[in-house]
Design a protein with these regions (language model features):
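N-terminal accessory/pre-domain segments preceding catalytic cores
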Residues: 20-125, 172, 199-204, 216, ...
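A short secondary-structure junction motif
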Residues: 135-139
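Generic domain-boundary/flexible-linker signal
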Residues: 15, 188-190, 206, 279, ...
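Hydrophobic/aromatic-rich core segments of domains that either
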Residues: 114-119, 124-130, 141-149, 154-245
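Residues at beta-strand starts and edge strands
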Residues: 7, 191, 262-264
Length: 337
């Protein structure tokens, strides 16, 4: 146990040292551009990126991400129609999941720009998914999510890798996209990930690397109607209209279930033995799957002892937990307000 502890301490110190060194070095990347917009977008990425990205990748890598995102917006007609908030969170951001990062944005942009340049936003999204299907097919796997270019090289990936690849491809050509995820199905032992793409002000879904003649058509349409949770992670401080299951200073988990089925607000009230509301009690919502109650969401009660989850019509197991430990500032946020 002690050995594990000290190994963890050494790893944390090494990561902290590498991160600090990389930050000092990458701080100079702002001197390599005089463009005000490039600096603004670069600052946005540095403000919200994971520390591991800061330690593992160079400033030049992130500056190229910014430049190709801007290039895509200026190249395609739909670039001018995308609101700044949507562009920053769903085009500019280079990361989709926990994949290793690579230069897929530049490669895909150069590969697809002539193929889709004269298309409408809607048709371009369909065409990008056709291109993704030409290069990648489904195969189950359990390892860490592969990078987009690695997925192309192997020509296969599980749904999480296919959707990471497809979101990256859509963003590379300036189409706002996000990976959607149901942590566990309500009807069978499994989960699934797919893609939503923003077209003219509306989010549409599609099966990653599973092209259809239209958007909002996918094999999972029927099971999604029985789902109890569909969510996505949005990097950065996001103020969209979607409900938040969880909010951290660096990212949010937003609830997308209402895009797929009829929902209801499940309100939980927590009181102590004296009948007084309990603030900051953790409320975990579990769905039975794979012989366990898998946590779909964890919320914290507000000052009135209440937590509200938007969910589907089905059965959930609810756990309540209240500890005496000091909560961190971000844990005091009430994502249900």
């Amino acid at each position: 146990m002690k050995k594990t502890f000290w190994l963890s301490v050494i790893f944390a110190l090494c990561l902290g040292t590498a991160t600090a060194q990389n930050f000092r070095k990458d701080n100079k990347i702002f001197e390599k551009t005089t463009d005000k917009q490039e600096k603004e977008y670069l600052q946005f990425l540095y403000d919200y990126m994971p520390l591991s990205d800061l330690a593992d990748y160079s400033g030049e890598f992130f500056l190229n991400q910014v430049r190709y995102a801007i290039k895509a917006r200026e190249t395609f007609s739909w670039g001018r129609t995308i609101p700044e908030e949507v562009f920053k969170h769903f085009v500019l951001v280079y990361r989709v999941n926990n994949e290793n990062l690579d230069t897929a944005r530049a490669y895909i942009f150069e590969t697809l720009k002539d193929r889709i340049k004269n298309m409408s936003m809607y048709d371009a999204a369909l065409e990008v998914n056709h291109w993704c299907h030409e290069h990648v097919n489904y195969k189950a796997s359990d390892g860490r999510t592969s990078s987009p270019l690695a997925t192309i090289r192997t020509s296969w990936g599980r749904c999480g890798e296919e959707s990471t690849f497809t979101v990256t491809a859509l963003r590379a050509v300036g189409l706002p996209a996000r990976q959607c995820y149901t942590p566990r199905w309500a009807h069978t032992d499994d989960n699934h990930a797919w893609v939503e793409v923003w077209i003219d002000g509306t989010w549409h879904h599609l099966g990653a690397c599973e092209p259809e003649p239209e958007l909002d058509i996918a094999w999972f349409d029927a099971p999604a109607k029985r789902a109890m949770m569909v969510h996505t992670t949005v990097f950065g401080k996001y103020d969209g209209k979607e409900k938040k299951n969880f909010e951290h200073p660096l990212y949010s988990k937003i609830n997308l279930l209402s895009n797929y089925t009829t929902t209801k607000n499940l309100e939980i009230s927590v009181k102590d033995t004296d009948g007084k509301p309990v603030e900051n009690a953790q409320v975990a919502f579990g769905l039975y799957n794979y012989a366990e109650y898998y946590p779909l969401a964890k919320l914290y009660t507000d000052k009135n002892g209440k937590a509200v989850l938007e969910t589907g019509f089905g059965d959930l197991m609810i756990w309540l937990r209240k500890t005496v430990r000091q909560l961190l500032p971000w844990q005091r946020l009430t994502p249900t307000r």
